[in-house]
Amino acid sequence: MYEFLGILIYFFIALALSLLLLGLPFLVSTRKADPEKISAYECGFDPFDDARGRFDIQFYLVAILFIIFDLEVAFLFPWALTLNKIGYFGFWSMMLFLFILTVGFIYEWRKGALDWS
């Protein structure tokens, strides 16, 4: 039990410091925002439209697809570096992973998630 005491103390100090840093702005900051600070800024001109307008759902779909395939690359790099050590099981596991992602990509493509019309 005593060998984990340092980790426990570190955890509680990190938790206390995190809570302090999260709560400190609520105690120190001003309560009322200036209208100039919350207005949109467009190169020194008055804004033409509301800056907090709605985006098309297509942008969110592309962002989600980007995150999915970005994670694929994040998994592929370590796999490629350790391919000679993990053997056939690691190879076929990654091939299954890539196959599932490819099937998902084809599904998204056929459903029209990538069409901008």
UniProtKB/Swiss-Prot annotation:
Gene name linked to the record: NAD3
Catalytic activity: a ubiquinone + NADH + 5 H(+)(in) = a ubiquinol + NAD(+) + 4 H(+)(out)
Family (UniProt): Belongs to the complex I subunit 3 family.
This enzyme's EC code(s): 7.1.1.2
Record's protein name: NADH-ubiquinone oxidoreductase chain 3
Transmembrane segments: 4-24, 61-81, 86-106
Function of the protein: Core subunit of the mitochondrial membrane respiratory chain NADH dehydrogenase (Complex I) that is believed to belong to the minimal assembly required for catalysis. Complex I functions in the transfer of electrons from NADH to the respiratory chain. The immediate electron acceptor for the enzyme is believed to be ubiquinone.
Keyword DNA damage: no
Main location: mitochondrion
Any one GO MF annotation of this record: NADH dehydrogenase (ubiquinone) activity
Localization, UniProt: Mitochondrion membrane
Signal peptide: none
UniProt xrefs under PANTHER family: NADH-UBIQUINONE OXIDOREDUCTASE CHAIN 3 (PTHR11058:SF9)
Any Gene Ontology CC annotation: NADH dehydrogenase complex
Keyword annotations of the record: Electron transport, Membrane, Mitochondrion, NAD, Respiratory chain, Translocase, Transmembrane, Transmembrane helix, Transport, Ubiquinone
Membrane topology type: Multi-pass membrane protein
Organism from which the protein derives: Prototheca wickerhamii
InterPro entries with a match to the protein in the record: NAD(P)H_OxRDtase_bac/plastid (IPR023043), NADH_UbQ/plastoQ_OxRdtase_su3 (IPR000440), NDAH_ubi_oxred_su3_sf (IPR038430)
